[in-house]
Amino acid sequence: MRKNKFTARFLPILLLFACASGSASAQSYVQDSKRDSARSDKLTGGRIEKTALIAGGNDLKITVNVPAFQMTLWQNGKEVKTYPIGVGLKDYPIFIGSRRASEVIWNPSWIPPKSDWVAESKKVKAGEIILPTDPRNPLGKLKIPLGDGYLIHQAKGVGDLGGLVSHGCVRVLQTDLYDLAEKIVAARELDVTPKQIIAAKKTKKTLSAELNPRIPVEITYDTLVVEAGKLHIYPDVYDRKQNTIENLRAELLSNGVSESKLKDNTLKKMLGLAAAKKQFTVSVRNIEAGRALIGGQTVSVVSRAPQRRTTSAKRKRRTSR
């Protein structure tokens, strides 16, 4: 039996603003920067169990860790899928704390908010209704409202991933956003058919499904995470003074890692390797063996999405067979 009512309709007037932004300072948006990432060993016991989505299994949760540029869908406390994301600019950072997803909306309209960045724009005006058919609409094919104007919506492209790119929203690649939405539809058994979803993808007609009850969304700002026995040092993208020697020692100690033999200079170098779009990772075992630097590596915060082969590349491959 279906648990939620569904309506397919045009909603140009009822749809809310994209990204809470205004002219408030960045500091006012950070509510709880001390909360641990949901992927931390302190919360998972050192192991994250994965699962395929269970249709009709209503226990859903979404978590975001901003410095890791990661969004994870959980069901019954198990990881269903993790998606790379882009987040808010320094001047318009994403809200840190608890939100709730209220709807899934395909082909949303956009109402520019009353904010400095809209006032400076020559293309749009605050309060103007910009339909899904309008090329000025930045939301793409789908959005998931989180309350107070904060959204999860479509990214412009791969270049958004791992970047500070929005006015307070979470940006996700279209294919990933479709995947997330369809998993939510299946788990909640929403009254929307595959045929309706396909039609929404192919057209600009607005389609919406209410989430009742709403899905909890937890957004954290955790730059120092021990996950599955490996330390991840993520860049302090909002310059919150999180990546300090004192904080790193405290993180290691709280995970049962002996840090007394680590010199401040070593910790400083480790922290310095996490910058721009790079993270530094090293196993706890290597840290305890005195290989905190030489046993670690600097890698991209977000792995690049696989590139599509060009037509010429496909021809070359066929002729080489």
For each feature predicted by the language model, list its residue ranges:
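N-terminal pre-domains immediately preceding structured catalytic cores
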Residues: 2-5, 15, 22-321
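Sec-dependent N-terminal signal peptides
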Residues: 10-17
